[in-house]
């Protein structure tokens, strides 16, 4: 069996090294070595009395170290691929998309010109339809009157008669595409003189009776 030796006889032990340093320099204070710092990086205490700056040493270390970066050829390929994708997206603009964009621009300009920016497209269309219906109503009335055979002059006379009398005094008579307007004839419900009185030669005394007789003779002729 192997006999276990004490730590003092192992030359490579760190405790043995420390014990030997303490024995050699008992009167002086020993400096503890920096065990946590890596071997390739110098300690900061070594730069206190030296003229070499810490920044220069760091720069030399970073320049000597190797960084794993992508080669320039791969970057160039990636850039070309991105540019090709962008050009393909731009080339996919069809005529339909162009028409949509054009219509949007025209609608925006129309809103700005008519001061209707706050309105939606549906509201603008509904207002446009309402104004068009208001304009079409008088045109439709004129067309219906033209189809009925009414001339503008006859329309004017009918309007004046309606305004004067308060009621429609016009009666339209149609006979084989011939249409005429005749005023209403108002006969007295009860004539002031009978036919027997007229035939006997009786003359009425009142002025109203005389006027009614004149109207009867004029209408009968």
Curated annotation (Swiss-Prot):
Stretches that traverse the bilayer: none
Keyword list, A-Z: Cytoplasm, Nucleus, Repressor, Transcription, Transcription regulation
Polar residues compositional bias, start-end: 33-48
A GO cellular-component term linked to this record: cytoplasm
Coiled-coil residue windows: none
InterPro entries, per the entry: TF_Nrm1/Whi5
Residue segments, region Disordered: 21-48
Subcellular localization: Cytoplasm; Nucleus
Subunit structure: Component of the MBF complex.
Reported function: Negative regulatory component of the MBF complex involved in cell-cycle-dependent transcription.
Recorded family membership: Belongs to the WHI5/NRM1 family.
Name assigned to this protein: Transcription factor NRM1
């Amino acid at each position: 069996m192997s006999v276990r030796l004490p730590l003092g006889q192992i030359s490579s032990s760190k405790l043995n090294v420390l014990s030997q340093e303490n024995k050699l320099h008992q009167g002086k204070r020993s400096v503890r070595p920096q065990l946590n710092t890596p071997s390739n990086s110098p300690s900061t205490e070594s730069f206190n009395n030296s003229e070499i700056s810490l920044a220069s040493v760091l720069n030399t270390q970073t320049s000597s170290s190797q960084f794993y970066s992508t080669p320039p050829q791969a970057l160039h390929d990636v850039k070309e691929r991105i540019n090709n994708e962008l050009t393909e997206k731009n080339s996919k603009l069809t005529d339909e998309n162009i028409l949509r964009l054009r219509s949007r621009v025209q609608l925006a300009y129309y809103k700005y010109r008519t001061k209707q920016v706050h309105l939606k497209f549906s509201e603008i269309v509904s207002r446009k339809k309402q104004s068009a219906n208001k304009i079409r109503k008088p045109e439709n009335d004129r067309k219906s009157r033209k189809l009925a055979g009414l001339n503008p002059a006859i329309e004017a006379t009918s309007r004046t008669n309606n305004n004067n009398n308060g009621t429609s005094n016009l009666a339209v008579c149609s006979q084989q595409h011939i249409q005429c307007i005749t005023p209403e004839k108002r006969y007295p419900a009860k004539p002031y003189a009978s036919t027997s009185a007229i035939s006997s030669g009786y003359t009425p005394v009142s002025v109203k009776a005389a006027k009614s007789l004149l109207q009867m003779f004029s209408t009968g002729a």
